[in-house]
UniProtKB/Swiss-Prot annotation:
Catalytic reactions of this protein: N-acetyl-L-glutamate + ATP = N-acetyl-L-glutamyl 5-phosphate + ADP
Organism of this sequence: Brucella abortus (strain 2308)
Entry protein name: Acetylglutamate kinase
Gene coding for it: argB
EC number assigned by the record: 2.7.2.8
Keyword Transcription included in the entry's annotation: no
Biological-process GO terms, alphabetical: arginine biosynthetic process via ornithine; L-arginine biosynthetic process
């Protein structure tokens, strides 16, 4: 008999989870969903079930999602070539139309449907809805390898959050609805901007003073030099690990986004493996969690 088939074990698991459920009751938890988990139907169903259970447990979950691979697939299908500056994609007018169509259209509604299939009320949004988020043009700089001079890149309609209004999200929380948000937002200049989903999630979580911001990735979390999972880090610890090279490569911007979210008012940010089924529940409702927690 497995644990799930054993009533006594089920009762023990629920009893152990109860204090954590009480801890997060009526609290905002923002989950950034993307990466490999999004491309796996079974993991997608497990994620939707986790989000539904959070709501049923009294938590206020907010889902922010990406969709880079799906955007690229649609651009290829439409014969739109991608242009890069300094290794970063330039989002021109045609591209941002596709980005909005894929993110706020197909992907967003797929996630909404999965959560609704679990008996909850999810609603698909983007930054444009209710003037929730206004963007400003993002400015990126690189060092020219030939001249060693800093160069400002024009990435087109790539933006960053400039203003976040939580009014709509508070209304939805009181209405028992689950927001699923695509990282697309208008600028005060009238243009539409594509925003990095991690950055967007951090801004939403900061505006809500969320108890937790969870980043679902394709790695277990932050690893030490022996490749073992670090369960908890302070901001100062994380910065030290960046300086000494323990945190490197693509993990650096992820951790820097976590640090920025904490500075915006988030209580704790977690990097965890979205490929692990029910990793969201394991992180929030078990003693040892499931990833790396970064705190002030």
């Amino acid at each position: 008999m497995t644990t799930l088939e054993n009533p006594e074990m089920q009762a023990q698991l629920l009893s152990a989870a109860l204090p954590y459920m009480q801890r997060y009751e009526n609290k905002h938890v923002v989950v950034k969903y993307g990466g490999h988990a999004m491309g796996n139907p079974e993991l997608g169903k497990a994620f939707a079930r986790d989000v539904a259970l959070l709501k049923q447990s009294g938590v206020n979950p907010i889902v922010v999602h990406g969709g880079g691979p799906q955007i690229q697939a649609m651009l290829t299908k439409l014969g739109i070539e991608s242009r890069f500056e300094g290794g970063l994609r330039v989002t021109d007018e045609k591209t941002v139309e596709v980005v909005e169509m894929v993110l706020a259209g197909s992907i967003n509604k797929e996630i909404v449907a999965l959560i609704n299939a679990e008996g909850e009320w999810a609603i698909g949004l983007c930054g444009k809805d209710g003037n929730m988020v206004f963007a400003q043009k993002a400015h990126k700089t690189v060092i020219d390898p030939d001249s060693n001079i800093e160069k400002v890149l024009d990435l087109g309609f790539v933006g960053e959050p400039a203003e976040v209004d939580r009014t709509l999200l508070d209304l939805l929380a009181r209405s028992e609805m689950i927001p699923v948000i695509a990282p697309v937002a208008p600028g005060r200049d009238g243009h539409t901007y594509n925003i990095n989903a991690d950055t967007f999630a951090g801004a939403i979580a900061g505006a809500l003073a969320a108890t937790r911001l969870l980043f679902l990735t394709n790695v277990p979390g932050v690893l030490d030099k022996d490749k073992k999972l670090i369960k908890e880090l302070s901001v100062a610890d994380a910065q030290a690990l960046i300086r000494d090279g323990t945190i490197s490569g693509g993990m650096i911007p992820k951790v820097e986004t976590c640090i920025d979210a904490i500075r915006r008012g988030v209580e704790g940010v977690v990097i965890l493996n979205g490929k692990t089924p029910h990793s969201v529940l394991l992180e929030l409702f078990t003693e040892h969690g499931a990833g790396t927690l970064i705190v002030p």
